[in-house]
Amino acid sequence: MSLALLFINFLLFPFDIDINCLNCSNQNSFSVLLITETKDWVHDSIESGIDLIVDIGDKKNFNVYHSDDSKVITTENLKEFNSIIFLNTTGDILNNYEQKVMENFIKNGKGFVGVHAASDTEYEWQWYGDLVGAYFMNHSGIVDRKIFTVDNTHIMTEHLNPEWNIVDEWYNFKYISDNINVLLKLDDASYDGGEHPHNQPLTWYQEYDGGRSFYTALGHAKEVFKDERFIELLEKGILYASNEDY
C-alpha cells in the first residue's frame, strides 16, 4: 500500500485494530469489510475473489477493507461498514466475542455477503447458519453444469438467461433455511452426486434478524471470478446487502 493510501486510510477510519484498505478514497460513498480467514481448506481462488471485489468497489464507489484475521471484528470497527463479506472462509473462525459483535451488526440493519465456502464455516453457531442460509455437506468435482434462473425479472438476476451453463464445483447442503429467497438453482438429477433432486438452491437473498444477507455457492474456480454473469451477480448482491442503490 502506498504512503498516500495509508494516510487516506487513517484519516477515514482510525480503527482500533489495523485493517488493510485495498482501494480507499474519500470519494467513495460507503465501506465493506472483506474477511478471508480459513481454519480448514484454503481455496486458491481467494486472491481472484479479492481482486474482483476491489474492482467492483472501484466501479460502484465503495471502499474495500480486507483481513484474513477475524480479530478485526470489533464493535468499534464495524461501526464504519455497511456489510461484511465472507469470501471462501472455512472452519470455526470467530470467537464468542466476535460472534456477538457480528450478531449485533446484523441486528442494527447491516448486511452480510457469503461466497462459496462461507457455508463451510461456523457449524456450531446456528445463528450464522441461518444468516448464510445453509450449511455445506459435500461437493462434486469441477464440472460444467446448467443453472436455472428462478426469476430473471428480479433486479439481481435480470441480466441472466433462464438457463445457462458455467464450470465450477457444486455444493450439496446438509441444512437449508426456510427463510431464503432463491435466485438460482440446479437440477441435481442431471449429475452424479446431486442430493437435492430437481431443487438444489445455488444463490439466494433474505432479510434476517434486522439485516440483509446474500449468498452464492458459486466461487470455487478462479475462472468464475472472471465470468461477466457472475461478476454482475456478485456486484448486485454486495449492493443489496449493503442497502445501497444498484
State where each predicted segment sits:
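Bacterial Sec-dependent N-terminal signal peptides
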Residues: 1-27
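Extracellular ligand-binding/catalytic regions of CAZymes and related secreted enzymes
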Residues: 17-30, 36, 59-62, 68, ...
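Extracellular/periplasmic catalytic domains that process cell-envelope and extracellular macromolecules
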Residues: 25-28, 58, 76-80, 95, ...
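Helical hinge/lid and interdomain linker segments adjacent to catalytic or ligand-binding clefts
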Residues: 31-120
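A glycine-rich, often tryptophan-bearing local segment used as a flexible ligand/cofactor-contacting loop or short
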Residues: 92-159
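Active-site donor-binding loop signature of nucleotide-sugar glycosyltransferases
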Residues: 117, 187, 218
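Oxidoreductase and adenylate-handling cofactor-binding alpha/beta cores
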Residues: 128-136, 166, 175-181, 219, ...
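Catalytic beta-strand/loop cores that center a nucleophilic Ser/Cys/Thr
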Residues: 134, 139-210
